[in-house]
């Protein structure tokens, strides 16, 4: 099953920025290095990276070395995992490309004007 989550917070920077969306897919087994979304409570989900796997339990960590999370002090079973992150969409990246293209277009128009005149 495919799920989509909006990310809030900086624990996964620079891999995932706050405001990004992650798409996840449930698997029966996960590997070290996978990015996963975990269900902490009914209304709380977190995204972290798997760093160790032992007896069906997973140890996790955030990618941001400047932050820490108490959630990383525990191990989690498959039942807590909603899915592996398969795609990250960052609207800010797309918007910055859009702004850059508009600036380039305006610069071109200013320098060269319309060729139809």
Question: Where are these predicted regions, by residue range?
Answer:
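Extended hydrophobic leader/signal-anchor segments used for secretion and membrane insertion
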Residues: 1-117
